Amino acid sequence: GGLWKTENNGNSFTPLFDDQASMTIGDIYADWTSGTIWVGTGEVNSSRSSYAGTGIYKSTDWGVTWTWKGLPESHHISRVLVDPNDSNIVYVGVLGHLYSTNPERGVYKSMDGGSTWSKILYVDDNSGAIDLIMDPSDPNILYAASWDRIRYAWDFQEAGKGSGIHKSLDGGDTWIKVSALDSGFPDGEGTGRIGLTIAEIDGQNKVFAIVDNYNRRSLDKKKDDSKLDKDKLRVMSSKQFGSLDNDKLERFLRDNEFPDKHTAESV
């Protein structure tokens, strides 16, 4: 666990975080110009062996010294983002407790380099932020993925109505859920973990999402009543069979992989 640094292309590593109060890391953010590193602690995979963290930490000297910056009840931090135009503006995705509900989850924002935090996106005490991305052309445009999950000693509920994708156009002041039922994205009790990314394609920034989906597929596809099937054939009288349209019978034979020697004319 912890955070490690290499200065020789991976031939050797030096631990940077061993003296801190957490061995599990959820996400890191490094500013290669200033030497500032942010570490969000706590593993987010939510397995039985996923250990909780102790909040978020900041170093301004490439990890030589660290300052704890709060969010002690976050337990599992999924993402740390920093505004490229103002390093004092920091966004943190907080997944929250694994084995219990708690209110310290969602998306948090700091305007003063981590001295204070405001919760800017909250779904419920069971749903936290599992991913968070920023539009590369506009840092005020944010997308957050919430995950409705809780683990018990005997069970893992890994999907729920609290899971979804949320979008902000104003730096997190307001949000809209863009994965609502009419959006085409899975939404409901079976929606699980979601991963997000954004990429420029043909001059436009496009968002991609991967989802662990347990929602049942809709069975509202209308059945073609005019098509001959085995159930109809089973209850058909000899007279009805004799009056069958040859095209319909031929299609039945081919759909059911009868040998080519059996045709509508021959049967």
Annotate each predicted stretch with a short phrase.
Residues G1-V267:
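Beta-propeller blade termini and top-face loops
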